[in-house]
Amino acid sequence: MTSKIFSPKISAVIESLRKLPTIGKKSSQRLALYLLDKSPETAIAIANSLLDATANIKKCVYCQALTEDDVCNICSNTNRDDTKLCIIESMLDMIAIEEAGIYRGKYFVLNGRISPLDGIGPSELKLDILQQIIADRKIDEVILAISPTVEGETTAHFISQMIAKDIKISRIGFGVPFGGELEYLDQQTLLHAFNTRTNI
C-alpha cells in the first residue's frame, strides 16, 4: 500500500511502477513524482512508446526474441552461422553475448526456465518450436547458455535429452557461478565461459 498522502491517481502510478523488476517502494515513489511533477512530457513520451510497442512488438517466429517483424534481425542475417544454435533464457542474455562479440550463430530464447512450482513447463518455453527448428535446420552444435540455477539445470537436462544424438551439445560453464545469472557476467567471464564450454 502507498502512503495516504498520495491521491488515488498518484498511488496508481506508484503501484504500477512497483510491478517492474528491481523497483521497490521508494524508487517507485521517486519515479512517479519525477514523471508527474518535473517531467510530464517524459511521462507522456514513455506512455506513448509503450502503447506503440505493445501494439506492434511480437516474438520472432524462429528464435522467440522480441521484434517488430515476423523474423528478427539476427535470424534474418545471412552472415550468421546457421549451423550453431545458442539456447538462452532471455533477451538480456542475448544482449550480453552480442555485446561481448563472442558468438556469430543463431539463438533460441526460452523466455524462462522449467519451474513446476511456478507452473512453467516445456510447453510454456515453446520447446516444440525449438525441436522443429533443430529438425529443419542443418545444426551441428547446440550451445546451452543457461544459468546454473536449480531450474536452469533442470531445463538444460530436459533440452539435452530431447535433442538428436548426432548433434553436438555443449554447455558454457567455467566462470559462471552456481545460481549466477548470465546477463550479469562481465564480458571477459562470458568469453571464457564460451571458450571453455564442455560437451554433454
From Swiss-Prot:
Record keywords, A-Z: DNA damage, DNA recombination, DNA repair, Metal-binding, Zinc, Zinc-finger
Domain Toprim residues, every copy: 83-177
InterPro entries recorded: DNA_Rcmb_RecR, Rcmb_RecR, Rcmb_RecR_Znf, TOPRIM_dom, TOPRIM_RecR
Span of zinc fingers (C4-type): 60-75
Record-level Gene Ontology MF annotations: DNA binding; zinc ion binding
GO terms (BP aspect): DNA recombination; DNA repair
Pfam families in the cross-refs: RecR_C, RecR_HhH, RecR_ZnF, Toprim_4
HAMAP family: RecR
Role this protein plays: May play a role in DNA repair. It seems to be involved in an RecBC-independent recombinational process of DNA repair. It may act with RecF and RecO.
NCBIfam families for this protein: recR
Similarity annotation: Belongs to the RecR family.
Name of this protein: Recombination protein RecR
Organism: Francisella tularensis subsp. holarctica (strain LVS)
UniProt lineage: Bacteria, Pseudomonadati, Pseudomonadota, Gammaproteobacteria, Thiotrichales
Name of encoding gene: recR
